[in-house]
């Protein structure tokens, strides 16, 4: 019989412990890594070379982090907050002069979709500083011709039935996806009332998706684009991006609202208004619409209404969602995640941040509980209101934090 060693004996502490830890079986290491949060995952993989190798077989438990961007032209660093580590913030430095002058419009994993003041577009990895430059925005293929005017405004000309139609447009909803290993990507923009465009790895221009005018909000998940309009038609469509050319696979209707502070809801004098509506795709593929409700007088977000509008390939009559169960909504990403209280992700909650617009709505960063109908502040940040308004939740992928 093998002799048992006391793990606290001086001899074991002196000689056996380091070798034993470094020689743990791969299946055991994998089981350990799969139970670690992102921050602890990064710490564990640096224990020794064998642990670092073992970490490549695992994916850390994901929990949303918050990123606060620098004020315009102030510095080239940003602040990261991990809700799991109460009071702990990280500073990411040396992101480049251009970073401080750019605006983040979307996130995917550790990647940020950025635009500079001249609307040059690029994707940046927050941790590795890898960068992917995107085609010039004016390089369009389709019926709509795009010409730059100033800053984030563009002029479009639509040629239809021998006639020209001119519009002044602005970039609205943006989404993207990127593969961590191959760097394959797709970036999608909504061009105001004109159309939706996309660009994939290897493209030299932007491709227009026909009949996608009046974009209000989009979500990209599992190679599908969920698209909604803001006109009286309130169209809701799903496009399959797994093919070379995107194909529409569903069409329905979802009422989307935005910037309706002066609109009464219910009886005269009702103190609240819907400031915005977002689409959210659940873990199982259902689609929710989430109304953000603000107090008219103070313009502070007070609560949310959640409705299920699509399930199992069919349009549903609005069904109010009273509980998300063990899922949490990440409103910035338009998705839900399975919650795990051991790493700090709260189920039946909505994680949300600023409006990311120039509206005068007060921007806060909170977690809203559907069970208690109360807001919980995430953290007291030492920053300006402008920084809070541009803050975003993101899901860090498994790269090392320095």
UniProtKB/Swiss-Prot annotation:
Domain F-box as annotated: residue spans: 18-64
Top-level taxon in the UniProt lineage: Eukaryota
Pfam families reported in the protein's UniProt record: Beta-prop_KIB1-4 (PF03478), F-box (PF00646)
Family annotation (Gene3D superfamilies): 1.20.1280.50
InterPro entries: F-box-like_dom_sf, F-box_BR-signaling, F-box_dom, KIB1-4_b-propeller
Name of protein: Putative F-box protein At4g22180
